Structures are given as C-alpha cells and as structure tokens.
Amino acid sequence: MEEDEFIGEKTFQRYCAEFIKHSQQIGDSWEWRPSKDCSDGYMCKIHFQIKNGSVMSHLGASTHGQTCLPMEEAFELPLDDCEVIETAAASEVIKYEYHVLYSCSYQVPVLYFRASFLDGRPLTLKDIWEGVHECYKMRLLQGPWDTITQQEHPILGQPFFVLHPCKTNEFMTPVLKNSQKINKNVNYITSWLSIVGPVVGLNLPLSYAKATSQDERNVP
C-alpha cells in the first residue's frame, strides 16, 4: 500500500476527471481549467453564500446550529432547488472560489481558495478564521493540518488562501488502507475533499460517495 499513499499527476487528473463527470451530472459546477500551455491545470468551483448573522448556502440551507460531522462523513445532504434565498438583498453575499491543484512537491492535491464580497472587497485571514466552524477550528489548530495560510497561486500568480498539504498523506493513508482492507474502490479526490472541504465551508453532496460505489459495481 506504500506506493498508493501518494498519487502522481496523471492519477490526480484521472481522479479529477471522474469527479467532474459526476459534478456535471448533478449540476455541482466543478470544472477543469487548463494552464496556458495546457500541460497541467486545476479543478475550480465558484460558490455564493449569504452572510446574515449565520452563513447560508446559495440554495438557502442555513448552517446556523449545524453539528460537526466526522471528517470522513462530511458530505452535504441534497437540497431542494426551490429553496432559493429571498432575503439576499438584505444580506451580504460572499463569493467563494475553490481551486484543487496538484502539488508536485508533496504528490497530493491541495485546496486553494479565496473569498470576497460582491463589491470586490476581499475577506481577510481573520474573516476566514471567523467563518470556520468551532469544531473544525480546533482540529485545524491541533492537526492534521498546520493552519490556513495565504500563498501565491502557482498557476495564476495571485494571492489565495491554502490548506497546507504537508499532513495530507498522514490523514489520507488510513482512508486508503481501510478501503483496500474492505476491497472498496474510492476516488482520492472525493475522500480528500470530504475531509478538508468542510473546514472552509465546502461540503460535497452525498451522491459523490454513492457515485464511487456505483462505478465500482459497474467494473466488469
């Protein structure tokens, strides 16, 4: 299993392609953006939230009073399309942009993100920390991550927040070993994002996990 603890760039791109395929099927808006020379690229998603005392998703599911899920189970339950927020005008809309890149140094995916109000005002690191749910904030301080920091986007050359990848292999190894033990197929990106995403307000619809199981059953 040692060779599976890290992933190569081609394997990363294959996992991303599988992930984006399901995203397109459910309208989750993830897409692949190639670099200028098309030698590499990254996954991207833009997400809007309402800031009005509590943070709400663009479909109107309030996170006020939310409970902390185990990191390996932090998937988003499906929402009804009719749950559209009608009070947006009286609130502040925040635009979140999430990028998933491959780290050649660590041989794992890395989550970059930035956030701003619709008038262009960026959120500061302090704002980002205030938006992290308390249970995830404690886990950030204790590990397996160092912390949220600000770095230059390796492809765009612009400032982004990032969850440092130095401990990714450490918390992903048990996931991979357990999946091998029970002979279960997993998409690395799906499992990894379900762990790190909720820390910065990014929850995956549960259907991603189901899609992986379905793909496994369809393998001849």
UniProtKB/Swiss-Prot annotation:
Q: Which InterPro entries match?
A: Atg3/Atg10
State if Protein transport is listed as a keyword.
yes
List the catalytic residues.
Answer: 166 (glycyl thioester intermediate)
Is this entry keyworded Transferase?
Answer: yes
- Give the UniProt subcellular location, in the record's own words: Cytoplasm
Q: Which UniProt keywords apply?
A: Autophagy, Cytoplasm, Protein transport, Transferase, Transport, Ubl conjugation pathway
Which terms in the Gene Ontology molecular function aspect does this entry carry? Atg12 conjugating enzyme activity; Atg12 transferase activity
| Enzyme Commission number(s) from the entry | 2.3.2.-
Q: Which family does it belong to?
A: Belongs to the ATG10 family.
Q: What is the name of this protein?
A: Ubiquitin-like-conjugating enzyme ATG10
The organism is Homo sapiens
Please name the gene that encodes this protein.
Answer: ATG10
